Amino acid sequence: MKRFFLLPLLLGAAACSSPQPETTTPAAPPAPPVVPGPDLTTLTDSNAAPLLRAYGQQYPAREVLLQTRHGNMRIRLYDDTPIHTANFLLLSRKGVFDETVFNRVVKGFAIQGGTSDHRSIRIREYRLPPEIRPQHFHKRGAVGMARYDSKVNPGKLSSNNDFYIVQGQQLTPAQAQAAAGRKLTPEQLQTYATLGGTPSLDGEYTVFGEVVEGLDVIDKIAAEPVGTDKWPKKDVDIKVKVLQ
């Protein structure tokens, strides 16, 4: 046992006999920049919509860059989904998405992100009123917001942070219309045939943007090996930067 204490004792003796260097108090780290916008811990189902509308009008932007180890996706956000767009911008600027991963990946369907087991930023679980527009459909690259199913959520209120990006599959016009919950336009049917998508989600979830660059990144993430819960076995981290 003595050998284990010998070196620390010698070091202690040397420290006592050596002059002590002058010590200085380390400077405090700079405070993080203050990001304008509503306090994420105070948003609720009842006040989120008006506060987010006001935020979007005061701090508008229409494009973000979503960065992953598989590459980047440039996403254009829609003007006519102002609540969802403002919410996505707010959480992006506050750094919420930078602490998240793609947590549910279903190849041939969609990749879902916005969740993390290690989030340090406090955020309340408020929901968003639906902004479902017939002109925004679930083509490949569509960006929508997840929600609980209609049995417990008949108002189709969206999650505040769980978003998804459509991969989908190419479908004939007949297949697309049969899968869709509403009447599709000829242009939408043609898009499902050439670009692909998941028409079964149309009319059920709010689509508030689309990938305009980096569609191939969707396929790379969708090809990740996943566990039984569809969570990729190797985390696909997310970083989101507001562009304009």
Q: What function would you assign to each model-found segment?
A:
Residues 1-14:
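Sec-dependent bacterial lipoprotein signal peptides
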Residues 16-244:
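Cyclophilin-like peptidyl-prolyl cis-trans isomerases
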